[in-house]
């Protein structure tokens, strides 16, 4: 084997970085120090240069056209001596061995430049021929636009080496940092670990455990043991696939104390060798720890600073005194969001929200900067700014009534004054009140027509969009399509907003009336009253799924397919199998036409909708087939209880109070129905945005400009600037921007969740450990009346864990949105960390007649699947009784 072309990484100190590239030199450095590194060879930078001189004409190199050079590299034959040397290295690593083929740029993994993700890496590669092809792909990645742009700004050399390394078939794997990545504290080692291969950690596909260790002693300072429903492993073809974690390991630590000590010792040694803080990829096999990669942390953490939800605010008084809350922000933005989701919310804030709220009757919609705010990946409403604007309207003239409904118990309003000022006064207020009154008259007269128009718009635009072939449309045609979506997105949000706000106002009026006339006896009534809301869209989805299940039950051959295949398999089986093709093309397609734009966190454009991935729907259908649900009977029983409860309480009220309550109840039901009828229209428009983004990224990936997998880290407003011709692809999808966004999202995942409501600044910190095996009572908000004793089922990943829910278990979740509704039909009760009186969990739980308690803050951390819970939906309390875990 020619050592100038291919060399074994043996720890030989004479092997220099300009031959090996950063990654290979780093591995060789670790091997020299005696650290455990899997066997590896390096195809040197000289080998790449020899190939380029042989395969690519100098004239082509001089043109500077990366795409043409890349194509030439991929199609050219490798000189025989080099080809033989690569194959010999494969043989040395083991015939049929599973290899990692990794790019090793000359300055990659250096102390000043990371290049993480800019050049190609291929894992679990088998066979000499495939290894040779992947080596060429790594060479070609040097000429990808994303890498070329990044390397120009970093002044990197234009040669590249490639590492061939034995893959560790890991029992557990992950990453560790030799300093706290959030705070920069160099006294800590932070470790993330999962079962199986580490690809799931890097990609975010799997849930991880987290550990914080004292660097000097290795003592465990904090640990977060999470429910881990899935892990990554290789299938027989060598492909990385997502598998269900065995029940016994789902809530068990993925690392033992001894393994943590091994990792801490290796972290200290590696840190000493490099003389810099590192992030290290590692794997454990048969209780032995292997180091896979070590990269200096080139983006140094800054000292922890106070964060503000409105960092753009220049007035320090407003910055310190503005009140922000994420209570009742709507399920479309509840929970942690990716950089793409956050940037889409900012697009909405700047271009949609203001014109949309004008339909509420606001004469002055203010400035976009006072609508919303953002903290560590979470979206907030600027309550101070909203209350200031709403003083234009007579019903919300008392701003503290509006403000306090968004507060949590820990917010102290003594001495609070709205930092934006007192709002409109005198003659200006009279004019704004008159404007509001005229708008309400218009809204009431046009409400029915508005609902009909929004339903028709959604159906018409869905039909039109599904008929488009995005792959054949030009850049300009896609840009025109985006502009069309902008217009209808604004129209549908403007139509929805009055119904949304009126529902809130009427629910508050309902609560006040119950309190005035019934005192404490009215709690159950205000939670059950809803005036024939059986047509809510969330209920329609579940009824639609049940209708599909009835169709399947009538066809034995089709039912057999559902019983034989997993939900993921059914996605490919149903469209092609003769027994199911008609069902897929008719009944199922009709359902998707109506509801397919639904999904989780619908402003989070990185998440697939049911049209994109129907496996969740198919999983629910499998559950309903196994555990039949009589939803119509359940809804009738709920209505009967509501009627009996209401009649008994109303009878004790004076006639005026009785008439007032009946009127509010009826009006609330009408507004809630209108709200739910118009909401799907703007949700559908967000799916159109997502589909066009995916198509554009597909094209850019083919040009080597960006990877489709980078979608969560793309900035939506930069994407729009690129589509409008205002920015180049290199500017809009700059590699360093994508990497910064990825890094920030990783920090948000590790950080403690910021408060639900906050005045002024917030100091971020890493997630604090929760009391393990805690038992006792949790208190939250009474959401849906009733009491139940049942086993808990904690679900933190809907798509991955939906199939775990068993009939008559209490569903425990961070929060729920419309996509969770089908599970409510099986649950005995609902418990959530986040929620309010009008959140999805409450509305649907009341409709299904099951008790619910929401806003318990950390229920998903304190409750384990299998615990016995005593859920009191009238008081909002949950008592945890530790016991045997539920099966499966």
From Swiss-Prot:
The keyword Glycoprotein does not apply. GO terms for molecular function: ATP binding; kinase activity; ligase activity; transferase activity. SUPFAM superfamilies: Glutathione synthetase ATP-binding domain-like, Phosphohistidine domain. Involved in the biosynthesis of 2-methyl-3-n-amyl-pyrrole (MAP), one of the terminal products involved in the biosynthesis of the red antibiotic prodigiosin (Pig). Catalyzes the transfer of 2-methyl-3-n-amyl-pyrrole (MAP) to 4-methoxy-2,2'-bipyrrole-5-carbaldehyde (MBC) to yield prodigiosin. It is able to use substrates with a variety of monocyclic rings in place of the pyrrolic ring A of its natural substrate. It is an enzyme of class 6 (ligase). This is Prodigiosin synthesizing transferase PigC. Pfam families: PEP-utilizers (PF00391), PPDK_N (PF01326). Pathway: Antibiotic biosynthesis; prodigiosin biosynthesis. Gene3D superfamilies: ATP-grasp fold, A domain (3.30.1490.20), ATP-grasp fold, B domain (3.30.470.20), Phosphohistidine domain (3.50.30.10). GO terms for biological process: antibiotic biosynthetic process. Its EC number is 6.4.-.-. Belongs to the PigC family. The gene is pigC. Keywords: Antibiotic biosynthesis, ATP-binding, Ligase, Nucleotide-binding.
